[in-house]
């Protein structure tokens, strides 16, 4: 699936804008700006994004399935409908013990300490 923004002023079901691809993590931009972005992300079972440290806080919402989010070596298990705010400057790993979809949102204020 192409990584382009969705059509503005047209209703959509966020779960349907991204599909699962075997052995992959798929990212689809919903809104992408210099000041931040919103993305739909699908994880196939067994996939992970690890060791990421962001200078920005990130809001994660699980929209289908269950996920494991590890923040500074502390595992947190999220199920459909649950959300978490990942603090800036923390090491984060997102694990798919089963396939799942999520929304990821971050907004840059311009005052973050970027190292």
PLM region spans:
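A cytosolic small-molecule/anion-sensing beta-strand core signal
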Residues: 63-64, 79-80, 98
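Structural motif
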Residues: 37, 66-68, 75, 91, ...
């Amino acid at each position: 699936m192409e990584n382009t923004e969705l059509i503005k002023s047209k209703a959509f079901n966020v779960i349907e804008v991204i599909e699962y691809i075997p052995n992959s993590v798929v990212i689809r931009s919903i809104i992408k700006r210099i000041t931040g972005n919103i993305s739909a992300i699908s994880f196939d079972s067994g996939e992970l994004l690890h060791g990421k440290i962001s200078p920005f806080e990130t809001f994660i919402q699980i929209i289908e399935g269950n996920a494991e989010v590890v923040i500074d070596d502390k595992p947190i298990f999220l199920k459909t409908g649950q959300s978490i705010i990942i603090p800036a400057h923390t090491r984060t790993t997102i694990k798919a013990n089963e396939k799942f979809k999520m929304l990821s949102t971050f907004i840059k204020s311009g005052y973050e300490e970027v190292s």
